């Protein structure tokens, strides 16, 4: 069978039954296996089993539907499948539709155990890849050699852009592959770069896992893989984001009429809480009204004029009920009114997923989410798809934000702890949502409710994905390892990632490295160049 050729602006494809050969500016960067393995998950008496797909063969033929549109089919012991490759001048989109019945498990893009070949994955000519994420582990690297795998994790940018940018020696530009889903179909956490073997040499494939939370009875099109061609790594992220907005996959936040006070500067009380610790009290235990009055008075005495003050962890007791601890905050309304008289807006630290103190019929459980070499699991978790919890949270937000008598009249939220979430096959929500999709459901609920109560309420958070653009006013650069000594560069890159993923978003530069004076002061001096000083 003859191979098909497609030529775009900066790339060309040679499309055959055994490989989709990708050229960038005339240089071959990868041979993608046309097949994708789609596993399933079954449950019996609370025990979950993953099933790998077997029995598929190299496609007998590829059909050219039109100029730039190609179709082929596959059959395995689990699914009938239809593959589609849609090419345009800027890039190409690869999609897989499964037909049959089952719950989708692990998905290995461009990899399969075909019966008629020893090849199990795709060949690569690129030498390294860029990970658009951030972490506090000093061992984390944004640039990895192609010969090493990367298992994605949720820590700071939650979720990150689901894409990788690849560099090939001899090329100035970059080749990118990104995973894109429809609204409501982000039932996954990870997007991983994996290694395999093709005969005696290394190959690669990309993967995600729906962990059995997406049921198919008929047909379902998996999140697609879109290929991009750009000038550099950040350009790939920008193109990934623009693709979502341009195709209607996501709604763009136009960011019109931004209140002046959203632009700061910001004072956050977290590190001051540590400095104010007394015997027998934890850092979180210093989230007290008297401590924050001291902070407010220090601000005044030093002629610092912030537009907002963040009351950090743990002003509330318990986390789930999310009401001011009466011992620590005997009169939060009096405090917020006093701050308003000083021109300062009060932002409350808010623990996402916090189920502490919630009724049993509003929460869910899950497994520990992978984090470095261990896992994090702090159940119970609030279930944002549960109608009882949704109604409960709306009442909580009204009490905290409203200026009505008896309410707290606060001005917004700093959303945190997004990584401590229900995870795994057993993490069953009332609405059947999971992963990034359930995270979006929680953001949607908080954002829409807050704006209804107080239109200029500020939502400060750390998602770095175009799907979350519409529910984030201010992106927080998040934590920094005090063992490092290059905070300006680390935070500067994170700011560029947020700007690439959510154009125009305000940037909260967050805290400095208090373990090293020189690194801290250098970052302080550079904060205005990066975002809003905090």
Regions found by a protein language model. Name each.
Residues 263-267, 307-311, 346-350, 413-415, ...:
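Hydrophobic faces of well-ordered beta-strands that scaffold small-molecule active sites
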Residues 267-272, 314, 351-355, 418-420, ...:
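Active-site beta-loop-alpha junctions enriched in small/polar residues
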Residues 274-280, 284-289, 333, 337, ...:
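Active-site-adjacent "subsite" loops/lids of carbohydrate-active enzymes
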Residues 303-315, 393-429:
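Active-site groove signature of glycoside hydrolases
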Residues 310-364, 446-452:
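Acidic/aromatic-lined carbohydrate-recognition and catalytic surfaces
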Residues 356-391, 440-534:
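Glycan-recognition surfaces
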